[in-house]
Amino acid sequence: MSSSDQNPAATPASSGPAEPSPPGRPTAVSSRVLDMGAQLAQALKPVRQMKQHACSFALYAHDLHRQVEVHHFVARLNQDVLQCAVYDSDKPSARLIGVEYIVSDTIFEGLAPDEQRLWHSHAYEVKAGLWTDVGVPEALQSSEMASLARTYGKFWCTWQADRGDALPLGAPALMVSPQAAEPGRVRGELVRGRDERYGIDSSAGGLKAARVEMDEPEWINPNADYWRLHGKGFAVDVVPAEMKRHAPFP
């Protein structure tokens, strides 16, 4: 199955587009007891490094008309590298739909051109008020947003819940960031729904106005946001391959 499949064959893991629920039995009491005990006994250090909850929107690289609200739970490896677990909501039942890696422009410029094509810029997404740390006053997050505007991200979606997949099916799909140009502009109803739910004002008089003086990158590498210049996206397909008989590395 390709990552660009619109309608995978009907399976118990396909339940329609609205709030797909994974197949399976209710969680047993014994499992809940284990979870509670493990929570007390284990440090869960990688998970506890997630310090921010950011909400934004993402588009499928092979079909920019498929647009989804995304929730990034962000861990900072250092000032130049972030790693984000991406969920479809911030509810307790949220699905882990992918992962995004974010790097500074300095690191991005050191990547090979073929690698850069898989990444997207964040400048418009930030300046337009689409990316925001939920519940954090703009005055507190403004410096972080200014830094983020100069970054690039690579986002793989592993669970296409928006098409009704009740489990992660097929190959990962590459995602891209919203842009000002069609067809990369996020639909207004998606933004309004998000803003109403969280009490956010991303209109021209809200976050956009607050960020209008924010410095923009001197340039955005043309290898990023590949579709804008080439009119094409990327999709992943799964093909059989010969297994390696010898270790590739010493």
From Swiss-Prot:
Compositional bias per record (Low complexity), positions renumbered to this chain: 8-18
Protein name: Oil body-associated protein 2B
Highest rank taxon of the organism: Eukaryota
Sequence segments annotated as region (Disordered): 1-29
InterPro entries assigned to the protein according to its UniProt record, in alphabetical order: OBAP-like (IPR010686)
Organism: Zea mays
Name of the gene encoding the protein in the UniProt record: OBAP2B
Family: Belongs to the OBAP family.
